[in-house]
Amino acid sequence: MAEGDAGSDQRQNEEIEAMAAIYGEEWCVIDDCAKIFCIRISDDIDDPKWTLCLQVMLPNEYPGTAPPIYQLNAPWLKGQERADLSNSLEEIYIQNIGESILYLWVEKIRDVLIQKSQMTEPGPDVKKKTEEEDVECEDDLILACQPESSLKALDFDISETRTEVEVEELPPIDHGIPITDRRSTFQAHLAPVVCPKQVKMVLSKLYENKKIASATHNIYAYRIYCEDKQTFLQDCEDDGETAAGGRLLHLMEILNVKNVMVVVSRWYGGILLGPDRFKHINNCARNILVEKNYTNSPEESSKALGKNKKVRKDKKRNEH
């Protein structure tokens, strides 16, 4: 290792230790070897109105001759606001070339959030809208970025026919084997559910895990069979990954599963996957449904999917 590299490495380690000491649990290590870190920043620790996740990767040349590579992740941050904040961070780097700047960046972002909280109130419908090209967090990210937004879709009444025990009981949650493709990681989580309240309970429990809470997207779908009405109560959530929730629910319909919910967490790694991301989301879900015996073997499930595609093609052919 060159002398300059050794010096940079030492300075990076000292800065990382300082950030961990200053910010405690707010600072987290995503990939120690790749020097990727993330910190959750808010306007107020006790009662946050605005929150943002800053992800940084420290190149070998930092802090000597190169800035940290950074990403900003917040559901409300877009357009001119994002550009202004990025310009502010880059200006700090230019004014402090050769110096450690992570602390300055964090406190600048905090100042922006405090100013924003004094000027405006967060809207009632603020929710994740991070598209694939936005910022995200990777495999071992463990910091929360306002997961409550994903729970808003679950404000419905509980059926009076459900017992109090059913309503209050948190079902067991299983976690599938992650799928990683081009630095994006997908992992499915499954729980048996018999009422909407349990859906909300499962989501709340999952969000206690900081890694899951800070996933770029937590897509979910559930199907509950109502025996008295012989109908299904079902719903889904994209969590910013457009159409992913509907595709996941459609998969569950094809597989004819019932009384189960599946959540698929995605940690975006900075490389666009295009349509492959939907394939990975559904594969994660199908794998765990098969593993937990909610459907047939992988081979039979594949046949069911193929049959459904054929039916759709035949239907389209007949329409012409």
UniProtKB/Swiss-Prot annotation:
In contrast to the mouse or rabbit ortholog, the IMPACT locus is not imprinted in human. Keywords: Actin-binding, Cytoplasm, Differentiation, Neurogenesis, Phosphoprotein, Repressor, Stress response, Translation regulation. The gene is IMPACT. Widely expressed. Expressed at high level in brain. GO terms for biological process: cellular response to amino acid starvation; GCN2-mediated signaling; intracellular signal transduction; negative regulation of transcription by RNA polymerase II; neuron projection extension; positive regulation of neuron differentiation; regulation of cytoplasmic translational initiation in response to stress; regulation of translational initiation. It is found in: Cytoplasm. Pfam families: RWD, UPF0029. Residues 296-320 are annotated as: Disordered. GO terms for cellular component: cytoplasm. It comes from the Eukaryota. Belongs to the IMPACT family. It comes from Homo sapiens (Human). The modification Phosphoserine is found at S297. This is Protein IMPACT. Translational regulator that ensures constant high levels of translation upon a variety of stress conditions, such as amino acid starvation, UV-C irradiation, proteasome inhibitor treatment and glucose deprivation. Plays a role as a negative regulator of the EIF2AK4/GCN2 kinase activity; impairs GCN1-mediated EIF2AK4/GCN2 activation, and hence EIF2AK4/GCN2-mediated eIF-2-alpha phosphorylation and subsequent down-regulation of protein synthesis.
